[in-house]
């Protein structure tokens, strides 16, 4: 039974890859990019579950999902769980796979070769707060989108273009059990801070992870 530290799962998400996707956020990241908007995923050892349990959760929605996006946290810090999850996803008949990593692309070469055929596209390199953000799917323009399969080329090449102004979007998702709301997607610099301030002014409890770009 392969252990996995999990932050959350959402379906459907529409802002991190093509179509209606399953989003899986790994818990734990030691990279600690200044300005990261996912600081809640940094702590290791939280959200312990198993890959089998995650696949049981995903199974009912696989046929409705166009693809899977794995983010975090740093998925490659749980390489065994990542590989098991990807194999399970494909056993279930799941669609394309996009994986985010804060590691440099060069440092992922060995891991990606071991996962050959299981990932269609990867977005690599750390988030850099001082670098502009104009390209789709990336938090900062230094991050590289690499297609790894024929399907990846077909589905993700279009994302190399700059994101047109007015086409930025975030998914808003609610946790029915806790009442929490999550925003999914790539916010513009300062968006999270502005949103938290607006919600607080309206009398809601709101917290934003650090984003002082
Ligand atoms: S941006 Fe990604 S890699 Fe960087 S600290 Fe945040 S979760 Fe980790």
Label each residue range with its predicted role.
Residues 101-102, 125-127:
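Short secondary-structure boundary segments
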Residues 2-7, 20, 38-99, 103-114:
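Conserved Radical SAM active-site core
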Residues 165-213:
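Charged phosphate-binding loop/patch that engages nucleotide di/tri-phosphates or the phosphate backbone
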Residues 101, 149, 185:
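Short beta-strand/turn micro-motifs composed of small residues
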